[in-house]
Amino acid sequence: VAAGRAGRRRRHRAAGPWPAGGGEGRRGQPGGQPGSGVPGQKEPGHRHISHLYGLYPGHQISVEETPELAQAARRTLEYRLENGGGHTGWSRAWIANFWARLHDAQKLQENLELLLTKSTLPNLFDNHPPFQIDGNFGGTAAIAQALLQSSAGRIELLPALPEKWREGCIRRLRAKGNLHVDLSWENGRLTCVRLSAPSGYRGVLSCGGVSRELILRPGESIRLDGRLQERLE
């Protein structure tokens, strides 16, 4: 017990000089780590952006629920990129996911293109350098985030669809709650979505400003049109 208390005291002393999380840097970024805009930063374009974990892959920061934090996160990304951020493939992929969560389809597209043109080898391996698979997984994750975002009890379709992706379809995306999603779109608008719930599902489904409650029993499926109205299978 005494050793545990001593260890806690050492950790508290070590953590003492760090800025408290949740604040803002000098340029409106979330504070809490060196490089986030607090005085004394040495690498304003640093590749790690760990203080935005709450934006992606976490869900503590969102455009709808925490707009002020979302705006601060946007400023963080702008500041990092203005100072040379995203110079490794995995970091560029993470940045693309951040923009997807901020519903900025244009910047998502720009960063995916940079990932492919500047940080991808001819065999499609991500170039850190050297090869680092985080960039490959992160790039595909960003594509999925453009098409579907989900948190506990809520699913959003096509939240960050780039203008260049005018039409397409995708199958077997997986939303939180063990929900399988097939969807298609034309002219940048949802045309059809099929949802299957092996374990059952209850939550809210939204797309393009339209929302509806979704209740499915275990093993049940439903097919909806572009306005989220039910269609016959």
Regions flagged by a language model, labelled:
Residues 106-232:
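Non-catalytic C-terminal accessory modules of carbohydrate-active enzymes
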